[in-house]
């Protein structure tokens, strides 16, 4: 009945949504990401510096349709997911980006604030430390 449906599907749906949101978040929220004002923004720099390469084990890369190779996707969204690894392998410039492991990605969860002077993301603890004279 409805109770069984909710008890089975709601946790699965919640976990799936949480993972999806986390994957999107870590692709863009890392310490040395690229954030610029409109007049200083550049397409290629935003693609290569503003999104990361989340290095996943092959099974997880397959399950996530290679979205960890996010910087290639940002440069050209028309590249099918099954060609992202090939594009990465054949283009040395695409390999010179921020690479995050799963552990690195988990650590980015503390990064919440953009520090304009250092042009990087920082956590609240560091912001408090920087604000204290």
Locate the predicted segments by residue.
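Hydrophobic transmembrane helical bundles of multi-pass organellar membrane proteins
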Residues: 1-133
């Amino acid at each position: 009945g409805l109770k069984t449906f909710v008890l089975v599907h709601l946790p699965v749906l919640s976990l799936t949504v949480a993972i999806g949101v986390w994957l999107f978040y870590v692709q863009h929220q890392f310490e040395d990401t690229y954030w610029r004002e409109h007049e200083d923004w550049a397409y290629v720099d935003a693609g290569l510096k503003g999104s990361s390469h989340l290095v996943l084990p092959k099974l997880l890369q397959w399950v996530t349709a290679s979205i960890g190779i996010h910087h290639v996707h940002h440069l050209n969204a028309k590249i099918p997911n099954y060609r992202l690894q090939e594009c990465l392998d054949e283009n040395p410039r695409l390999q010179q980006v921020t690479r995050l492991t799963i552990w690195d990605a988990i650590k980015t969860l503390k990064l919440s604030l953009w520090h304009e002077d250092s042009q990087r993301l920082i956590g609240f603890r560091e912001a408090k430390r920087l604000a204290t004279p």
